[in-house]
């Protein structure tokens, strides 16, 4: 059942008594989600199993052989059989009513007595819901991957051993690590350089620091000869000194992050400016990029305010909430 109210969209999905559900993307602290309240929101510090995480998804699968995908970039709450509406309440057993809780844990424990998943999508005036059938959970996940586009198959080295050097690393220290690993026969496929490889961070210039890496092309050639792939750490907030800053000004949001522009990647122009510049780094010998700190400020602390707010506006018409999620 889907209902549109002044608040937004409310969705109800039936749950059987012996039904378990799993999902919501990358979740560190919970696996079986029945009886929980989940908010799969992009965030840099997953805490307490609430659903805040680096890679959330508004998708879950059921042991009954189906999956539910709520196709939205809005902050969405899933009550996974944790709450019961008045008209469907079950009569408590007499012995339960007589029980007196004597601890905080007992008093407020989750009794998992709901028979529906209640999905709350505030601000939505309509919603697209995909019901994906199995019959098995594995079949559901396979079909979800086909529906969502699947993604590319990573190269074998991308599944190998990685080592990242500290943010204050230099060309000489990187080569010392590289030589040490090979001399000691310590497996290492990828060397990651934290954002200190740039002239400015945070926000990012995307320009090599001549002070720390005076001959970076020579270093990349040497690392390639030793069998290393090189991964650069960065984020998408563009420093005033960046060569792409001016070009991105018309295609960025109305809030800064660390004095850096926030590109509106919904717009093809912003996407092209950003990727074209990064293609020059790939041509130099870089094999990949790690997008650090692109997953929102820690929403668990009032002092964590560095990221753009949910009310930010972007030229494409998207707001900050949706931009965080996409």
Q: Could you describe each region identified by the protein language model?
A:
Residues 1-155, 164-167, 171, 178-183:
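Catalytic and substrate-binding clefts that recognize carbohydrates or anionic sugar/phosphate headgroups
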Residues 55-57, 64-66, 117, 125-128, ...:
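Structural beta-strand/beta-sheet cores of well-ordered domains, especially the beta-sheet scaffolds
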Residues 5, 16, 187-326:
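Aromatic- and carboxylate-enriched substrate-binding clefts and catalytic-loop regions
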Residues 147-164, 248-262:
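N-terminal small/glycine-rich loop or linker at the start of catalytic domains
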Residues 86-90, 95-99, 157-158, 189, ...:
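Short, surface-exposed, polar/charged, turn-prone segments marking secondary-structure boundaries
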Residues 137-150, 174-193, 274, 278-281, ...:
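Structured alpha-helical segments in the cores of large, soluble enzyme domains
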């Amino acid at each position: 059942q889907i209902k549109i109210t002044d608040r937004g969209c409310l969705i109800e999905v039936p749950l059987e008594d012996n039904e378990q559900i799993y999902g919501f993307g990358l979740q560190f602290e919970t696996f079986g989600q029945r009886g929980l309240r989940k908010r799969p929101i992009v965030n840099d510090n997953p805490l307490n199993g609430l659903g805040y995480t680096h890679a959330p998804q508004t998708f879950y699968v059921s042991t009954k052989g189906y999956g539910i995908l709520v196709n939205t970039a809005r902050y969405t709450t899933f009550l996974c059989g944790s709450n019961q509406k008045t008209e469907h309440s079950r009569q408590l057993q007499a012995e339960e009513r007589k029980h007196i809780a004597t601890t905080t844990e007992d008093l407020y424990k989750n009794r998992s007595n709901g028979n529906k998943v209640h999905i709350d999508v505030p601000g939505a005036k309509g919603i697209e819901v995909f019901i994906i059938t199995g019959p098995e959970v594995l079949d559901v996940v396979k079909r979800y991957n086909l529906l969502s586009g699947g993604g590319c198959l990573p190269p074998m080295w991308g599944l190998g051993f990685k080592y990242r050097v500290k943010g204050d690393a230099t060309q000489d220290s990187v080569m010392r690590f590289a030589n040490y690993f090979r001399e000691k026969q310590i497996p290492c496929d990828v060397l990651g350089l934290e954002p200190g490889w740039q002239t400015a961070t945070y926000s990012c210039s995307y320009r090599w620091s001549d002070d720390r890496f005076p001959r970076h092309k020579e270093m990349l050639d040497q690392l390639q000869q030793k069998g290393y792939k090189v991964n650069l750490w960065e984020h998408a907030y563009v420093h005033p000194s960046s060569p792409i800053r001016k070009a991105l000004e018309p295609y960025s949001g109305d809030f800064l992050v660390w004095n850096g522009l926030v590109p509106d990647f919904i717009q093809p122009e912003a996407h092209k400016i950003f990727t074209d510049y990064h293609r020059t780094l790939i041509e130099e010998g870089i094999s990949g990029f790690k997008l650090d700190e692109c997953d929102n400020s820690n929403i668990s602390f009032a002092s964590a305010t560095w990221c753009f707010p949910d009310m930010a506006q972007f030229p494409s018409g998207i707001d900050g909430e949706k931009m965080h999620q996409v």
